[in-house]
Amino acid sequence: MSKCSRCLLDETVPELKINDKGWCQYCEIYDRLCINYPIGEKGQEKWNQILAAIKASKSKYNCIVGISGGVDSTYTLLQAKKMGLNPLAVHCDTGWNTKIAVTNIKKACSILKVELVTLVIDWEEFRDLQRSFLRSSTPDADIPADIAILATLFRVASKYKIKYILNGHSFRTEFMNPIGWTYYDGTYIKNIQKQFGEKKLKKFPNFTISEYVKHVIIKRTKIIQFLNYVDYSKEQAKEILVTELDWKDPGGHHHENSFTHFFQSYYLPTKFGIDKRKVKLSADVLSGRISRHQGIDELKITYPIDMQVVDYAIKKLQLSQDEFNSIMNEKPKSFLDYQTNANFISRVWWAIDFLYKIGIVQDLVYHKYKILTKIMKKKK
């Protein structure tokens, strides 16, 4: 059984590799990210340089902040305003927002006097796409939302001629989803829908390689993870948001979205034995907020399941109970069983490596694709 002796990742991560120290490759990536994104004085110096570049922008808005109503994105928006930035808040509505999340978004933008752009995804197409991914029997049923959000942020940035997108991800609190648990690309989206869907995707904002080249390489639009440069505490952030923005906690990790709540608490653990708390708790272990033993004890507690959320998801997706049961009983598969861009990415790894070295490709993208390239070479 493969199990990392440092974090909490184990044999449920198909690509897990253990080095001579007993650590996995994701721990090694964490260490590299700590070097690239220091906190304290060095982190502040790096952030000040980025902040100056953002403020030098001549656009009406000097940055975009993607907002979901959760703690990380709302805190990022608050800090952007406090640092003197003029952000445009962007929300991608996939039809699964909780009332608490919607209220949090509206209150934050109102109190901070930030303009909000909300793009509503075509529900009929999106529902059909989500059903397609459930029918594909892969653990990637939540990636249509990730793709839609990413595409939306870049397209809004292009429309308003904005070069910087701030997001609320921090590797110290969120770590990094293993590829075997979460893989996405535009070709994957197209082919899963073609194989399992009932509708053509005419309005869905897919994010293809050509879109990546257009926005990231040609237009040089950058995604900035502000929280990587600061000593970020979710609990302290929540207290600040409650006090300053009358923010309400949606509940669990990413439970501001009802589908993600269903997906992480029921679908993944029940069908695949995947517990995404391992990622979050691994971040807590590696950053020293808890001990590894505390993390292990936390995982012994069964992921709380709200059957009302499960029933709501099945009903909203318009799945019969028989079809849902069939989906849950189908043999698990992965992105490797379907047509994706993975082979292409592994073939052009030299280009990705070059673009990373000159500061165009993001750290997390680079490291994830490096692991992917090794997976694809091994597959051959």
Model-based region annotation:
Residues 1-63, 79-348, 353-380:
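Nucleotide-activated chemistry modules centered on ATP-dependent adenylation/adenylyltransferase
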Residues 63-72:
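Short, glycine-rich nucleotide/cofactor-binding loops
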Residues 75-76:
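Hydrophobic positions on the alpha1 helix immediately C-terminal to the Walker A/P-loop
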